[in-house]
Amino acid sequence: MTTSIIERIDAWAEKTPDFPCYEYAGTRLSYKELKRQSDALGSYLLKNLKTDKEKPIIVYGHMSPLMIIAFLGAIKSGRAYVPVDFSMPVERIEQIKKAADPALFICTEELPENLTITDCPVLNAENLVDALEKHFDEKPDPTSCVKNDDNYYIIYTSGSTGNPKGVQISQNNLVSFSNWILQDFSLQQGLRFLNQAPFSFDLSVMDLYPCLLSGGTLVPMDKTITSNLKDLYHEIPAQSFDVWVSTPSFADLCLLDPNFNQENNPNLTRFLFCGEVLAKKTARELLVRFPDAVIYNTYGPTEATVAVTQVRITAELIDAYPSLPLGVIKPDMRLHIIDQETGDVLPDGEKGEIVLIGASVSKGYLNEPEKTDQVFFDYKGYQAYHTGDSGIIKDGYLFFQGRLDFQIKLHGYRIELEDIENNLKKVSLIQNCAIIPKMKDGKVDMLVAQVIPSPNDFTKEYQLSAAIKNELKEFMPTYMIPRKWIYKTEFPLTMNGKIDRKALNQEVNK
């Protein structure tokens, strides 16, 4: 059982000093070097930063080894870090800087030319490397390290007002999450982990910390690789992954390659999915292609430290339910389904809002007390969070029922878009899909289905559409069937590896 993230990671510098903790673009970082360089940075920060330790450190960059050195260096100086990926627009970076009010801006890559930082000290990449060299072999005071309920990291998520919200995750939150992942998912020492998500997306926490805590090797697939399918399909088998952590959409992208299978990836025996709904088709295809692998579906919002439920996906489970379960809650958490109107806890089998209670729940949004009070609350002495997700419990499993705010009204009918997508994914002719409402005069005019079709013998798109509609009529009411159909070979993905619904929406609502 881990009680201190830093102590456990640093211990590998003694046990396996030369083992690589990180491999990126031909460079290897050993556990010994990770400790030495993060110690050096921690010492530098303790000597040079005199502002309040409540102020976090922004770490800007992408996937270079300097990113995790900066993360751990910040922690050793007693400050939380805020990861900011270099793919973020300048306006977004400025919003995060303003909201976080950081003590320092560490840059592992060059800042955009049109971004000027004047009200906060900046440590650029050149000066960062210089600081690491000058403080070679210095060790920070271990009592200065982030501990217990101190903030460990702060990740900014989209806010309904357009301004990002900083979710505060403490050392205790991360310890709870990490112990659960390492135990329930049987992650042994020395495994190679895929890092698909940028560090500004909390899915990355699911590979970064379980990897470092178990003495493994983190192997990032950066934007230059994931944006080029030919490079991606070549790189995956070359990296000999043991553990796959990604969104389902990223796996769907890889499944387009017929060579993505056990034969070409013999070590790949664990798939961990989070961040999106895992479709039955995706899970079934992975079980066929990777007979030696175990597949886990997980669920959790950023506000509850990445994930709080898990279930191992089997062929029997796929056949047993209309959609895949999200699993069972982790041992130190409680999950309630509540009536959104009355707040009453609902019995199993009734649909309501998912409320999470316990050790994984964040203390709230940084410097946002009003927004915090809207969704976080105390439940019998435990921190609790209104997820805004709709769910139902059947046979002890949690099932996702869509977002409470992802409903539309069409011709008087209240419709959940995820409900339509889940039904479309049952159709044999559909591999993946996204439903986009077409707007007219401020209201929904019709539903547009963007579809990646399964291989078929139709020569005309209208023939394919007719066949899909005919199959849909068996289990979906007519008013829910999309009126327009757009066919694609692949979907655009966000930097986090999710379907880029904003881009699809712009395409439909030009």
From Swiss-Prot:
It is found in: Cytoplasm. ATP binds at T157, S158, N297, T298, Y299, G300, P301, T302, D389, K498. The gene is dltA. It catalyses: holo-[D-alanyl-carrier protein] + D-alanine + ATP = D-alanyl-[D-alanyl-carrier protein] + AMP + diphosphate. Its EC number is 6.2.1.54. Belongs to the ATP-dependent AMP-binding enzyme family. DltA subfamily. This is D-alanine--D-alanyl carrier protein ligase. The keyword Cytoplasm applies. D-alanine binds at D202, V306, K498. Keywords: ATP-binding, Cytoplasm, Ligase, Nucleotide-binding.
